[in-house]
């Protein structure tokens, strides 16, 4: 039994794992398949992470993973398909978390941290994948500085699109807001 199972191996999951290991806890990180460390792996140049100026997002994610590996964090390379909280004893707040994986194996822990992350809603336009990280971006705050003094377009239909367009209007020469 683990003290903590962390589902997701992006920056949040690996950070949680590092802190848990430093606290001498028995921790495992479950990841469906290793494709870099979350969304950051798809970022081009990352220039806003302290201590690593102008690093490629994939390389920065690799440094996160190397840090976790150096502390002997255990990785479970399987997809978590079911999570169940099971009563453990008489106290209502005392539970054990059972995580079932895609190969029907089960791991148990006293605590569970879910950091599976998010994926951007892509537009599906030609060239989008080819230019991701090379002009196509999904985070105005993360990547806005790359467009300083340039013309930019924000594609979206909700509050985030408007917030991003307003944020970029202080950085960019001109900003177009394209409503989906």
Please tell me what each predicted stretch does.
Residues 33-57:
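Conserved N-terminal glycine-rich FAD pyrophosphate-binding loop of Rossmann-like flavoproteins
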Residues 1-2, 6-32, 132, 138-180:
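Rossmann-like dinucleotide/flavin-binding elements
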Residues 58-75:
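Helical element adjacent to the flavin cofactor pocket in flavoenzyme catalytic cores
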Residues 17-18, 41-42, 124-127, 165-167:
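Short amphipathic alpha-helical segments
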Residues 1-7, 23, 35, 42, ...:
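FAD-binding core/adjacent interface of flavoenzyme oxidoreductases
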């Amino acid at each position: 039994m683990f003290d903590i199972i962390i589902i997701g191996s992006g920056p949040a999951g690996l950070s949680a794992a590092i802190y848990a290991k430093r606290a001498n806890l028995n921790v495992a990180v479950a990841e469906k398949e290793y494709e870099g460390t979350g969304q950051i792996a798809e970022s081009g140049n990352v220039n806003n992470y302290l201590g690593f100026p102008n690093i490629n997002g994939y390389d920065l994610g690799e440094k996160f993973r190397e840090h976790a590996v150096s502390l002997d964090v255990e990785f479970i390379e399987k997809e978590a398909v079911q999570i169940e909280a099971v009563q453990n004893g008489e106290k209502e707040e005392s539970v054990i978390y059972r995580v079932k994986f895609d190969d029907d194996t089960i791991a148990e822990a006293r605590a569970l941290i879910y950091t599976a992350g998010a994926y951007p809603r892509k537009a599906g336009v030609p060239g989008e994948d080819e230019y991701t990280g090379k002009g196509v971006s999904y985070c105005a705050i993360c990547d806005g500085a790359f467009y300083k003094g340039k013309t930019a377009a924000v594609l979206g239909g909700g509050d985030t699109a408007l917030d991003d367009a307003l944020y970029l209007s202080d950085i960019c020469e001109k900003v177009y807001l394209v409503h989906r």
